[in-house]
Amino acid sequence: MMSMFDGLFADLKQARESFEPALSPREIGKITSVATGIAKVSGLPNVGYDELLLFPGDIYGIAFNVDEDEIGVVLLGEYWHLQAGDEVERLGHVVDVPVGDSLIGRIINPIGKPLDGKGNLGTTERLPIERPSPAIMDRAGVSVPLQTGIKVIDALIPVGRGQRELILGDRQTGKTAIAMDTILNQRGKNVLCVYCAIGQRASGVAKVIATLREQGAMEYTVVVVTEGNEPPGLAYVAPYAATSIAEYFMEQGRDVLIVYDDLTHHARAYRELSLLLRRPPGREAFPGDIFYIHSRLLERATHLSKELGGGSLTALPIIETEAQDISAYIPTNLISITDGQIYLSPALFELGILPAVDVGKSVSRVGGKAQRAAYRGVTVDLKLAYAQFEELETFARFGARLDDDTLKIIEHGRRIRACLKQPEFAPVSMAEQIAVLVALTADLFDDINLDNMPAAEQAVRDAAANITDDIVERLESTDKLSKDDKAVILELARQALETFSTDTDLGEPR
C-alpha cells in the first residue's frame, strides 16, 4: 500500500517539476466614451501609434491619437453595441491584410473579410497596410506603356506602367467608366488589377462588380470594398490595404494596375475622423496632414528596378470636383502628387462627346516616354491639329466670317473629335487605334459627312483586322512606323472608306 502511495507522490512531484504554465500577458484598457466611428480608451499606457486594438464583438480599432492619459481610437466596424466601461485589448501589431494569389477574383473589405460568400481566402500570408515606399535607387523609369484601350488617352495622354495618372471631373462625367475600360483592356496582357471602392454606394459597387464578371475581368482582378454606410475608419484604411495587396504582386515582378475610386471620399473620411478626434482643422476644415496621407499612398506606385524583379504598380486615383473647380484644395493636392491628370468635362459630356476628356486640361508628364513609337509618329500632328481646332471653334460659334483654310481646320478637327468618341466597355486594340489615327492624319475622313463618321471609323477598325501579324508585331514593338507599313495601313483604310458619302458642307455648324 505504501509503495503505491510512494509511486503516486513521485509522479505528482515529477509532474510539478516539469510543469510550465502557459501564461500570456494581456494589456486591458477600458472605453471611456464612444462617438461616430471613434472611441476614447484609457488604461493602455504602452500602446503605440497605429497599433491594432480589439474591442468586444471582435471589432478592431486603430490607436490614432496617443495622449498621456487617453487614446483616440478609429473603429473598423459596427460600434453600436460598444459602451463606456467595455474592455479593450492590445494586440501588439499594426493593421495588416491578407495577400496572395488566392485573392484574385475575390471581393473583400479592407481588413480581409470576404464579402462574396465564397468562404475563406485560403492564404496565411499578410502584409501591413502601411508600408514605406520604394527608395529612389530601387526604382526604374517608366518605359512600358499601359494600354487603356481608350483612343483619346492612348493617343494623346498616354499612361505608362508605374505611373500615377489622376482622373478628375464633376460627378456623373464618366470617371469610373474610364477606370473600368482600362481594367477590361488588361485582359490577356499579364496585368493584374485591384479595384478599391472607397465609401461608394452599394448599388454603384454592385454595378461595377457585375460588369467585371460579365466581361471576364474578375479572373485577374481583386476588389476591395467599403460602402458609404460603413464607419469612416474603414474608408480611411481601404486604399492602404488595397495597395499592400497590389505591392505583393509587384514585388514578385508582376505588373499591377490599381484604381482608387475615389480619394475624395477618402479625404472626407479622414477629415471626419480628425474633427471627431479634436485635431486642429485647416483649409476647408481638412487637417494639416491631408497632403501627406495621399502622398505616402501614391508614392508606393512605381516601376521597380530589374534587380528587384522589374514589377510595376500603376495607380489611377479618381477625384470628384465641384462645379468644374480643379483649383480646389484636394484636386490641386492630387495634381501636384501625380504624374499627370485626365480631366473629364461636363460640357463635353452634355454634348454627347464620350469619353468627355478635355484634352487641353489633361496631361501625362511621363507617359509620353513609354508610348509606342508607332503612336508618336502619328500623334504629333494630331495634337497640333486638335489644339488649333479647339481654339478656332470658339470663334466659329460667334458667327465670325472665316476663310477657307480656317474652315478646313475646323472641319478636320470635328472629324478628329468624332473619331476619338468611344462607347464605354468597348476597348479598342492597338492595331485598330493606329489604323484610325493614320487615316486621320492622312485626311482620309475629311470628305466624309459627320453623320457617317461613326460608321466610317468602325469600317477602318474592321479593316485593321486584315493587317498582317508581322506588321502588328512591329506596331507593338519599339520600332517606328515605317513608310511601307504606313502605306499598307493607308491602303486598307482607303478601301474601307470608298463606300461612304463625300457630301460635306464646310463651315456649317454640326
Curated annotation (Swiss-Prot):
Q: Name one Pfam family in it.
A: ATP-synt_ab_C
Gene Ontology cellular component terms for the protein in this record: plasma membrane; proton-transporting ATP synthase complex
Give compartment(s). Cell inner membrane
InterPro entries associated with the record? Alt_ATP_synth_F1_asu, ATP_synth_asu-like_sf, ATP_synth_asu_C, ATP_synth_asu_C_sf, ATP_synth_F1_a_nt-bd_dom, ATP_synth_F1_asu, ATPase_a/bsu_AS, ATPase_F1/V1/A1_a/bsu_N
List the residues marked with site Required for activity. Answer: S362
The alphabetical list of record keywords is: ATP synthesis, ATP-binding, Cell inner membrane, Cell membrane, CF(1), Hydrogen ion transport, Ion transport, Membrane, Nucleotide-binding, Translocase, Transport
Function per UniProt: Produces ATP from ADP in the presence of a proton gradient across the membrane. The alpha chain is a regulatory subunit.
- Protein name per Swiss-Prot or TrEMBL: ATP synthase subunit alpha 1
The gene name on file is atpA1
